């Protein structure tokens, strides 16, 4: 029996003053210390065509050299390759995972290029959900692999988005925080770049693609996020090479016509991307992944399993009520299955009995047939035996008669010989 427990409303809360220092003002410091000791994780998905500069931009963003294999255009399909790294800046540790889409856009038929990406994102959500559903959970030590940010690299065509880009972003926008960027922006003239940006944003809106919105509800970041949002998609240039500019060395790309400085905001939007992705909104990206994208996946999965927050009449359902309903449903299904199996067993037994009776009948018929055949054969043998015995008797009689005649003939011959001798004498 469920017992309703009342919750205090905001009107019931009273503000009280303290007569002395208690110490809970140290809670923010406690949280910071705990988070610092645990470290942080951040997972970036880089989606873009082969050779568009994904690896170079990652190296430039984090000011290090990550491992990367030379890319080819001969991949039979799209595959995702994830690599994790431990980074440390001051006393803050970051477990960074970079996921690359190898072979994206290289196939002739690109209709299903987005599927491996969607499957990978869902697989990370599923792994986290399975950990959450365990009786003994260990989320504290769990390596969270859910994607927090998707950097979508757009080829610098200067015209419009490719259909592959629109389809892929539309499939991903409900699963991940998409940040569109124009790669190799130094290949487009400035006036064309502004038009290209406007065209991209217009196409995203008209096709209903939801990209990541920089938060503007917090005072500390509202102004900078509002300012930076107008520059989307960020036009970036990546480079790990340093070029001497004046008396300083700076990351740049050297061309015959001049130098493109990576961190010069007049040349590209790299600094804006770094500010928005890492320095200002990294925690919001992590939070949005958990509270929005993962929650959507989790809700859909639980609904598939039969767990819902409301009943058919839209009345709230408690977890206990849901459990009882699922338990009763399961027991009903179990009883139904048991009855079906019982009936199936009875039917099989009857079928087997009928088969055995039929086999027994056939055996009796075969036995009777063999018995009759045996009797007939026995009678034939006995008749044949009688015939043989009669033939033997007849033969014996004939033999005796022949012997008698032979004996009489011999006696008659002896008497005749004697008479002949007597006459001569």
Swiss-Prot record:
Region (Disordered): 399-425
CDD domains reported for this sequence: CDC_Septin
Residues annotated for GTP binding in this entry: 48-55, 103, 184-192, 238, 253
Annotated localization: Cytoplasm, Cytoskeleton; Synapse; Cell projection, Dendritic spine; Cell projection, Axon
Region (G3 motif) residue spans: 100-103
Record-listed N-acetylalanine modification sites: 2
One Pfam family matching this protein: Septin
A Gene Ontology BP annotation from the UniProt entry: cytoskeleton-dependent cytokinesis
Keywords: Acetylation, Cell cycle, Cell division, Cell projection, Coiled coil, Cytoplasm, Cytoskeleton, GTP-binding, Nucleotide-binding, Phosphoprotein, Synapse
Low complexity compositional bias, start-end: 401-416
Chain intervals for the UniProt region annotation (G1 motif): 48-55
Record keyword Metal-binding present: no
Coiled-coil regions, chain positions: 320-410
Domain Septin-type G, residue spans: 38-304
Gene Ontology MF annotations: GTP binding; GTPase activity; molecular adaptor activity
Record-level GO cellular component terms: axon; cell division site; dendritic spine; microtubule cytoskeleton; septin complex; septin ring
Principal location listed in the UniProt entry: cytoplasm
Residue numbers bearing the Phosphoserine modification: 9
Entry-linked InterPro entries: G_SEPTIN_dom (IPR030379), P-loop_NTPase (IPR027417), Septin (IPR016491)
Annotated spans, G4 motif: 183-186
Function: Filament-forming cytoskeletal GTPase. May play a role in cytokinesis (Potential). May play a role in the cytoarchitecture of neurons, including dendritic arborization and dendritic spines, and in GABAergic synaptic connectivity.
Subunit and interaction comment: Septins polymerize into heterooligomeric protein complexes that form filaments, and can associate with cellular membranes, actin filaments and microtubules. Forms homooligomers. GTPase activity is required for filament formation. Interacts with SEPTIN7, SEPTIN9 and SEPTIN12.
Family, similarity comment: Belongs to the TRAFAC class TrmE-Era-EngA-EngB-Septin-like GTPase superfamily. Septin GTPase family.
Protein's UniProt name: Septin-11
């Amino acid at each position: 029996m469920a017992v309703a427990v009342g919750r205090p409303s905001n009107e019931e809360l009273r503000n009280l003053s303290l007569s002395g220092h208690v110490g809970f003002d140290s809670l923010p410091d406690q949280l910071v210390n705990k988070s610092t000791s645990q470290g942080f994780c951040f997972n970036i998905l880089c989606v873009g065509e082969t050779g568009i500069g994904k690896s170079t931009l990652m190296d430039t963003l984090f000011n290090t050299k990550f491992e990367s294999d030379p890319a080819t255009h001969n991949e039979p399909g799209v595959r995702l390759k994830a690599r994790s790294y431990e980074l440390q800046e001051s006393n803050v540790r970051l477990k960074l995972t970079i996921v690359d889409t190898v072979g994206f856009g290289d196939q002739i038929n690109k209709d299903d290029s987005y599927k491996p990406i969607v499957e990978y994102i869902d697989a990370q959500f599923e792994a986290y959900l399975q950990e959450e559903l365990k009786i003994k959970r260990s989320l504290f030590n769990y390596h969270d692999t859910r994607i927090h940010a998707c950097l979508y690299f757009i080829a610098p065509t200067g015209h419009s988005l490719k259909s592959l880009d629109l389809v892929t972003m539309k499939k991903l926008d409900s699963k991940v925080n998409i940040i569109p960027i124009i790669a190799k922006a130094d290949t487009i003239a400035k006036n064309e770049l502004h038009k290209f940006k406007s065209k991209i944003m217009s196409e995203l809106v008209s096709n209903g693609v939801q990209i990541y919105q920089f938060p503007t509800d917090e005072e500390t970041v509202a102004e900078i996020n509002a300012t930076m949002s107008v520059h989307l998609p960020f036009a970036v240039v990546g480079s790990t090479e340093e070029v001497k500019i004046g008396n300083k060395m700076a990351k740049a790309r050297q061309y015959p016509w001049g130098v493109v400085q990576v961190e010069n905001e007049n040349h590209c939007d790299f600094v804006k991307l770094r500010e928005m992705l890492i320095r200002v909104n990294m925690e919001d990206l992590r939070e949005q992944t958990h509270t929005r994208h993962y929650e959507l996946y989790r809700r859909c999965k639980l609904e598939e399993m039969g767990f819902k927050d409301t009943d058919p009449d839209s009345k709230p359902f408690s977890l206990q009520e849901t459990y009882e309903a699922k338990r009763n449903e399961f027991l009903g299904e179990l009883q139904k299955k048991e009855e079906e199996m019982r009936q199936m067993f009875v039917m099989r037994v009857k079928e087997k009995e009928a088969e055995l009776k039929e086999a027994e009948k056939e055996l009796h018929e075969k036995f009777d047939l063999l018995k009759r055949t045996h009797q007939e054969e026995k009678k034939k043998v006995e008749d044949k035996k009688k015939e043989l015995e009669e033939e033997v008797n007849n033969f014996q009689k004939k033999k005796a008669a022949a012997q008698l005649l032979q004996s009489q003939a011999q006696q008659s011959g002896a008497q005749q010989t004697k008479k002949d001798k007597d006459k001569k004498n």
